[in-house]
Regions:
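Nucleotide and nucleotide-moiety/phosphate-recognizing core
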Residues: 2-134, 164-170
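Conserved alpha/beta core of the MobA/IspD/sugar-nucleotide pyrophosphorylase nucleotidyltransferase superfamily
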Residues: 2-4, 146, 150-203
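Short aromatic/basic micro-patch
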Residues: 110, 139, 176-177
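Short, surface-exposed amphipathic charged segments that create phosphate/polyanion-binding patches used
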Residues: 85-88, 142, 180-185
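Conserved nucleotide-sugar donor-binding
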Residues: 135-146, 180
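A conserved catalytic-core signature of glycosyltransferases
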Residues: 133-135, 140, 156, 172
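Nucleotide phosphate-binding site architecture
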Residues: 16, 26, 145-146, 184
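Glycine- and other small-residue-rich loops at beta-strand/loop junctions that grip anionic moieties
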Residues: 104, 137, 175
Length: 203
């Protein structure tokens, strides 16, 4: 089966050592970030969404949107590219030809469906940019996907893929949830972030 629509991956297999708690379960408006990411990808038109997590977190993810699949990375310590490879291999079991995949790390939540739509309207691999700063999610085309699949699991994605920078209207794009201080920043801005998530998104 081949999908003309993009496919989505949410990466949340990291061990969250610096934050001290699971990033995927951080809530905005009472909804975990992993759920927000899945919703945004589905609203953007992704034909399938897969969450890549670790064994410990898998049983604590709770209810995800209908149709979202979950796969476990047995070696999350190998980093983001390893998790991306786990997700891609899972997608390959259902879609033998991967044309375009949207990859969203759960700890970079400052985007919504409109950002994905803008990215997939371009050809090739792309990443969003707001006020000169690049962010996530990113879109990988078939050539980039092959590079990722053939790379060591600890390789840096920026060394594997040449992303086209695409301007987007995403004031929260640089938001990162990696440390307690960054989580505190999210809490201070939670109401505004929730308004951004839900404005015009049909949620």
């Amino acid at each position: 089966m081949t999908s003309k629509a993009p496919l989505g991956l949410v990466l949340c297999a990291g061990l969250s050592k610096r934050l001290g708690s699971a990033k995927a379960l951080v809530e905005v408006g009472g909804v975990p970030l992993v759920v927000w990411a899945c919703r945004h990808l589905l609203d953007a038109g992704c034909a399938a969404v897969v969450v890549v997590t670790n064994e410990q977190l898998r049983s604590n993810l709770g209810a995800l949107p209908n149709g979202v699949q979950v796969v476990t990375n047995p070696e999350p310590e190998n980093g983001r590219t390893g998790s991306l490879q786990v997700g891609l291999n899972h997608l390959l079991s259902q879609f033998p030809v991967l044309k375009r995949v949207v990859m969203a790390p759960v700890d970079r939540p400052g985007w919504r469906a409109g950002v994905v739509r803008t990215l997939v309207a371009k050809t090739g691999s792309s990443c969003p940019v707001f006020e000169g700063r690049r962010g996530h999610p990113v879109v990988l085309d078939n050539e980039a996907l092959q590079s990722v699949l053939n790379a060591p699991s600890d390789a840096s994605l920026r060394d594997l893929v040449d992303f086209q920078a695409v301007e987007v209207d995403a004031p929260w794009l640089s938001l990162n949830i990696d440390t307690p201080e960054q989580l505190s920043e999210l809490r201070r801005n939670e109401e505004a972030l929730l308004a951004y998530f839900t404005q015009g998104e049909g949620i």
